[in-house]
């Protein structure tokens, strides 16, 4: 159970809406309740949904940070689906696409076909588990714990591939939001929470990438003190507990 909680560090630190937060909390509760009561097959289903949510949040970050690349990833979809994804206002809109298909967006962060094939196997496991086929694939805690270890390896791998996206997202945030006079929120903490974390669904792991960002890249910016102030506020307010 303790290892399984590691996934929380890859999910959004906080949410823009209470509905989204309640949904993720519901999935965690479903996982924990079924795990505790030995219903490991159902615990796996809830954990898989949390994992797919993580993938949706990563794809959302691509959409927000590299919209041109995201648009290229839409090639091959039907016009209606393409428009739906292009106009998406929430990462959960990606759930309208077949899970195996949505994984192809991970090519945009340099995940090759071999890796995506491995990730797709997790979707196949979910499909086998969710259908009434007379089989209990996860009948023991050991079996589920082994699968959780495998899932977390995949999550960490995807997170590593996402690093350039997070760095680009944060760099742009610092450049565009360093002036309290012409940004969305005059207070640094509010700007970070609402515009950086909520709009991009940043996780604790993402925030760690931001904290390690070298702000000296922007030392020639006319408002470098404002950039330093934003960065220091992030590091102070979101230091890993």
Q: Which sequence ranges carry the predicted segments?
A:
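General structural signal for secondary-structure boundaries
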Residues: 97-101, 109-112, 137-141, 196-209
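Acidic, Ser/Thr-rich low-complexity intrinsically disordered segments
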Residues: 173-232
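Short flexible/disordered coil segments
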Residues: 126-135, 194-202, 232-241
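Amphipathic alpha-helical interface elements
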Residues: 1-103, 121, 160-182, 221-240
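Charge-enriched, short contiguous segments at helix-coil
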Residues: 18, 105-172
